[in-house]
Amino acid sequence: MKNVTDSFVSLGHWPSAGSFGFNTDIFATNPINLSVVLGVLIFFGKGVLSDLLDNRKQRILSTIRNSEELRGGAIEQLEKARARLRKVEIEADEFRVNGYSEIEREKSNLINAAYENLERLENYKNESIHFEQQRAMNQVRQRVFQQALQGALETLNSYLNSELHLRTISANIGMLGTMKNITD
């Protein structure tokens, strides 16, 4: 047994270079130092760390709230834009329908105006033709009358001699004189 106790005692006195043994110096041992450092860090750093985490949590919650508000505003704006789009689409449909009916009305007005113009032109043409026919008939009548008068004058001149001519003039002068006396 003595050997066993000697071996434990000798373990405590081994040189530290390259050997294994227990270090009885509490401040020189690593696990104790680490536990002390960790304990101090936990004790003093707990408040700082919780403050940092609380600040971070508040910033995250604030960012989430802001994002939710922005999302709500965006949804509201989207609904307004959709309502405006529906309104504009309805107005566009009304304009399209009204535009088509206006186009059809203008088309029928133009067609009616064209028919009226054609009718007027047709009437003018007919009047012009009628006028030209009347003028041609008047010219033919004048020509026939002139030729008949010319023929009558030639016939009269061939039958008249100077004595008959003088008697006709005297008779006409007498008739004019009688007419003058009656009118006075």
UniProtKB/Swiss-Prot annotation:
What's an example of a GO molecular-function annotation for this chain?
Answer: proton-transporting ATP synthase activity, rotational mechanism
Its placement in the membrane is given as:
Single-pass membrane protein
Q: Which UniProt keywords apply?
A: ATP synthesis, CF(0), Chloroplast, Hydrogen ion transport, Ion transport, Membrane, Plastid, Thylakoid, Transmembrane, Transmembrane helix, Transport
Superkingdom: Eukaryota
Q: Which residues cross the membrane?
A: 27-49
| Any one cellular-component term (Gene Ontology) | proton-transporting ATP synthase complex
Q: Can you say where in the cell this protein is located? A: Plastid, Chloroplast thylakoid membrane
Q: How does it assemble?
A: F-type ATPases have 2 components, F(1) - the catalytic core - and F(0) - the membrane proton channel. F(1) has five subunits: alpha(3), beta(3), gamma(1), delta(1), epsilon(1). F(0) has four main subunits: a(1), b(1), b'(1) and c(10-14). The alpha and beta chains form an alternating ring which encloses part of the gamma chain. F(1) is attached to F(0) by a central stalk formed by the gamma and epsilon chains, while a peripheral stalk is formed by the delta, b and b' chains.
Q: Which HAMAP family does this chain map to?
A: ATP_synth_b_bprime
As for what it does, the entry says:
F(1)F(0) ATP synthase produces ATP from ADP in the presence of a proton or sodium gradient. F-type ATPases consist of two structural domains, F(1) containing the extramembraneous catalytic core and F(0) containing the membrane proton channel, linked together by a central stalk and a peripheral stalk. During catalysis, ATP synthesis in the catalytic domain of F(1) is coupled via a rotary mechanism of the central stalk subunits to proton translocation. Component of the F(0) channel, it forms part of the peripheral stalk, linking F(1) to F(0).
Family named by the database record: Belongs to the ATPase B chain family.
Q: What else is known?
A: In plastids the F-type ATPase is also known as CF(1)CF(0).
What name goes with this protein?
ATP synthase subunit b, chloroplastic
